[in-house]
């Protein structure tokens, strides 16, 4: 896009003098707007300013170094402001049209197959990417759970979760679990960041949070991460199907036998997801207590329901592997 300069002012905002019309797609966490803009009634693009101050230049880096290795599962990057522009950074993408952010197992399986591909990239391809994601690493998350142990116990008691789960929280905080190698992660792969076009194609969006992490990070965001604006109902059968697909696809890409450690990997996932969901419940609970929140409270209540359901289902799946005491107290509400 050689003429991008005529559409963007030096301060990194759209120049209305050379634009036919514009419409807001969504608002970033820093208040800046991602917009579709038309240069004529027939031709449109997507303008994305820096929407998160901690991710400056990262999405462009991922496009330049990573995404060209994959099929067209992402909108094409047409122009950018160049590195080091700070709050004046911007990018322009192709407009892939109206998008549907609706959960289906078919879509999730398509995404997880591509995920296995970027997780299988050797470290030499992503060695220069920043190490931080949009949320704390799992070790920091569980440390916070221990710091807020009194609140955690209240939530666990309310949901009928045995205090035995606190033992696993302490083990993870000590670094005794989740010791696998880190891979390149999308970083924020909830339902709002992948979508179906009108022609039925699946696109994976918003790569500005890409960073090295455990493969469980991306899997949790795809499967069990809830979002106030993009509700979904995850089932145990869908969760199993997505995990099986990921394990088999990863094994095929790496030339290994997927069945060898399938149960162990699933147990790690269920524990990771339960810990992350418990932490998310504390965040949602905090938002619900605020008089003014970023999200409508009815949306937060829906998110609470989805997250608590994921937590309980993952603990029940973990219980299926246990011979002795379980995580779920069967006497509660019986």
Model-derived segments and spans:
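ATP-binding glycine-rich phosphate-binding loop
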Residues: 14-39
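ATP-binding glycine-rich loop module of kinase domains
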Residues: 31-57
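Short beta-strand micro-motifs within the conserved protein kinase catalytic domain, predominantly
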Residues: 76-87
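Conserved short submotifs of the Hanks-type protein kinase catalytic core
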Residues: 86-98
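Conserved kinase catalytic-core helix
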Residues: 98-133
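Active-site catalytic-loop/activation-segment of kinase and kinase-like phosphoryl-transfer enzymes
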Residues: 130-175
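Active-site activation/catalytic loop segments of kinase-like enzymes and analogous catalytic loops
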Residues: 216-255, 273-294
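ATP/Mg2+ or Mg2+-diphosphate-binding catalytic cores
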Residues: 273-334
